Amino acid sequence: MKEELIYGRQPVREALKSEKRKVKRLFVMEGAQGKIIEDIKQLSQKRKIPWEIKDKTFLEELVGKNVNHQGVVLLAQPRASLTWQEILKKNKTSPEATVVFVDRVEDPANLGTIARTAAFFGVEGILISKARSAPLNSPVVRASAGGIESIDIAQINNFTQVIKEFQKAGFWIVALEADGDKDIWDADLRGMPLGLVVGGEHEGIRRVVRSSCDMVLRIPSRGVINSLNVAVALGIGIYEVMRQRSTN
């Protein structure tokens, strides 16, 4: 199995904490200090992962001269993913479970921010289309600030078929689109497990995927810009779900 490099203090710490991937070795730049650095060292010792002090040149040769590694690099195997069936089985009995369907998001920064947002709100899982999606590699981990390490992820081939299986299990599937049928705050999102669907940077949600959803909602705009970055839209969407669920 091909190994990956994880870099940045927060991503490295979260990778060590989550134990979702096997780690081979930790490299710490000489002179690197701070609480997170100490946390990283302690976690590596707890997991019996060998670590070495290296100079700046060594780390730059590993990850690239223009990469902000923040003085720590982790050599690890790719993180373990689940199947969509496993994510569904874990959450189908929860009336307030929330999962995210990501349809063809190609920018690693956007996919990483989606994972960070989902982890922040405690979303139960992310289901990502395999076709035309950013790979779950080091830039995605970095953009997620390590959030991708703590959340269940599945990569799926037949996107619409998986949506139908979640619907059969009682999930209500909601697409977020700029031209949605109604404003998100006018929809009742309480009392049911939800799947929120977001689409790629260029085409949005594919028509065949959109037609499979139970609702298509929009985030209302009052300015001259009529659309949001996909990760920002998802964050607002999840927040509205959580807000509604917290009220009677």
Predicted regions and their residues:
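RNA substrate-binding interface of SAM-dependent RNA methyltransferases
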Residues: 17, 21, 28, 85, ...
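Short, hinge-like loop/turn segments at secondary-structure boundaries
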Residues: 68-72, 142-147, 190-194
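N-terminal positively charged helical leader segments and presequences
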Residues: 1-89
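Short, acidic/turn-prone active-site loops that include or flank metal/cofactor-
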Residues: 31-32, 57, 131-133, 201-203, ...
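Structured adenosyl-cofactor binding patch, chiefly the S-adenosyl-L-methionine
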Residues: 142-147, 207-248
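Active-site/ligand-binding-proximal alpha/beta "capping" segment
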Residues: 174-229
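Short hydrophobic alpha-helical runs that function as membrane-insertion/retention elements
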Residues: 52, 126-129, 218
